[in-house]
Amino acid sequence: MQEQYRPEDIETQVQLHWQEKQTFKVTEDASKEKYYCLSMLPYPSGRLHMGHVRNYTIGDVISRYQRMLGKNVLQPIGWDAFGLPAEGAAVKNNTAPAPWTYDNIEYMKNQLKLLGFGYDWDREIATCKPDYYRWEQWFFTKLYEKGMVYKKTSAVNWCPHDLTVLANEQVIDGCCWRCDTKVERKEIPQWFIKITDYAEQLLNDLDTLESWPEQVKTMQRNWIGRSEGVDIIFDVVDSEEKLSVYTTRPDTFMGVTYVAVAAGHPLSLQAAATNPALADFVAECRNTKVAEAEMATMEKKGMATGLYAIHPLTGEKLPIWAANFVLMDYGTGAVMAVPGHDARDWEFATKYNLPIKPVILAADGSEPDLSQEAMTEKGTLFNSGEFDGLNHEDGFNAIADKLVALGVGQRKVNYRLRDWGVSRQRYWGAPIPMVTLEDGTVVPTPEDQLPVILPEDVVMDGISSPIKADPEWAKTTVNGIPGLRETDTFDTFMESSWYYARYTCPQYDDGMLDPAAANYWLPVDQYVGGIEHAIMHLMYFRFFHKLLRDAGLVDSDEPAKRLLCQGMVLADAFYYTGNNGERIWVSPVDAIVERDDKGRIVKAVDAEGHELVYAGMSKMSKSKNNGIDPQVMVEKYGADTVRLFMMFASPAEMTLEWQESGVEGANRFLKRVWRLAFDHTAKGAVKPLDIASLTEEQKSLRRDLHKTIAKVTDDVGRRQTFNTAIAAVMELMNKLGRAPQETEQDRALMQEALLAVVRMLYPFTPHVCFSLWQALGGEGDIDTAPWPIADEQAMVEDSKLVVVQVNGKVRGRITVPADATEQQVRERAGQEHLVAKYLDGVTVRKVIYVPGKLLNLVVG
């Protein structure tokens, strides 16, 4: 082996070996335990960023480790290739989205290969290819036939910049998640899939996901939002109309003082027809943001409709108000308002001088003070007629039962989850396979006409979708009847909801999935991706799997057994203020910094002399110009160094702070491993280790080696605390670096240790370990070498160090045989002169002994 560690010499050579040998290509093998490790597929934006590198390194470490355990490991990769950014880039670069996307895929594929990830490239998919989305279209038509798909005109979140519909989850603080434009409300026809039919399953099956982060499961539970309550029917004064509301607090029903309805509710529209001011208010409400999350913070506005509802139990007339905080597509579009015991209702009632009636006593049994805020806690009912004195649960049931008995109420389980709107008014997506015939009938595209292919050779004007702008594209016939194709395309979450299953059989042409392959590999054993996907992708991913199961395509209930959500990658961010007061962000690579003695940045300038403001560590992003190009780092330090730093600098699920000094440290460590191996191999052949004749010092070192193997095995496999696994190997390396190399036994022990170290580091730094394994004379390629197994006998300690206390104060430390009895330990302590002087002339009244650790003698 060469004397110096030169990653540029090693890594290309090893990657070529993997490619030629097809090392990571796998097929189904019933004789082996399978392991399917998957990282969330990337969007081909053009270049990898450090977030990608972290995600895929974690997945690769797990995959390589599981392969060393003898499992048949599938680790595929592909491209989530449809989506809006391609349209923007196409307009900007005067091209079409397809060539831009395919060029990016090619570039990023080479970047992934440079990092040494062990993918089965034969399974690569790009979701924009017809051989992928044809099956998505086929499945959609099957869902339509089953009654799981419908079209309706719906109030949607509309981004006026991107000219597309956004899911509620895609609206952040009233703005588009992608371009930050203020979101508007618009009503357009949309295709929906009935995810609400699966709400109960999606909720209950979270309990089976024992190896998913609690945070993700909690977010999904909250998003599904199961509640138990009562649907209540109110009569409307001088009208045949009925008003239905849903409440989870029937115990407060006697405190209702008004009813609020959505601007789009039939009663609002009826009243607005003869009230111009109300009509203006309704129009204003219907053109504002609709994301539920915004409702809590926005100003509550309302207007009286002039209509009244009748309280079903008291007969009171309750004013009906149109209000901007009621959503037409949640529940019934109407809410009963109990301002005494609901913060939002109190805020609205206070603003518009509506009555506030308390019906729940304070915790101390007194009437609550509602002058400053509502009392939202549950408690004993009062002011509630026959229900006075009942506690929350009894009050809930008594009032619910009475409403049911009177025929004006029905107990109901409700969900916050809404059906999945999958229509997008964009070009670069999979066409929705539906056709509107001449007579207005809507039918699915026949199977023999699938896929409905998206034309790729198009001109983008940045305004309208090429397939909407081309009337010829939409023309088709079904059973000889002319019709027009749907020109909306699928939400790109459709593609990413089932890609994991297609990886099991990407070339299969006889159906959406090959049942044998899908059921061999699925469910995914380990899924890796960001927490930001908790309630969109991960919900749709779970939902789609249940749809596939119910179509007989897979036989498991959930798509992934274990989920790891990696933290974000942060980097220093710097800026200076431009002439117009704007912040001009400067890359940390271009910042010249001064630090204090604690390493904190105290001053920074750029090459042009601008004094920079240090904005702290923040997520690597284009907007703050603080991304670090992985390729630059790989060229400078090698892929193994970048991978090692990524896995060592922070626990996988925590944020990682990018520090080049840390990268340099990882590089120095690999050089030390290389140097130790070089020095060892330079001394020539090694004889086998004779375990029976090891010295105490050699036994101690071998004990440390096997304890390290046991710890690293647990850290990588069960605990997934990869940083502590690396730290343990580093600690062992320090001991190996100090170990004498005088005798044959010393060298034989070093050989055992280095072969183990190289295998423990292999999942993290595979290129250098591949070379070191060969240099050390390891059997075969390290790619097929087994994971080291800790020798239980080697870890057994012959002796123990026991701390001796007298009256709780440490007076000495003694070494005793590992199997020494309490009596033997006491006798040995009495012989220790540092201890003996405290026992002279006193009586031992009590002995506290923690075997092998502590002896405390209480004397008096």
From Swiss-Prot:
Positions that bind ATP: K622
GO MF annotation list: aminoacyl-tRNA deacylase activity; ATP binding; leucine-tRNA ligase activity
Reaction(s) the record says it catalyses: tRNA(Leu) + L-leucine + ATP = L-leucyl-tRNA(Leu) + AMP + diphosphate
Organism expressing this protein natively: Yersinia pseudotuberculosis serotype O:3 (strain YPIII)
Family, as annotated: Belongs to the class-I aminoacyl-tRNA synthetase family.
Keyword Lyase: no
Protein name: Leucine--tRNA ligase
GO CC, alphabetical: cytosol
GO biological process: leucyl-tRNA aminoacylation
Gene3D superfamilies noted in UniProt: 2.20.28.290, 3.10.20.590, HUPs, Isoleucyl-tRNA Synthetase, Domain 1, Valyl/Leucyl/Isoleucyl-tRNA synthetase, editing domain
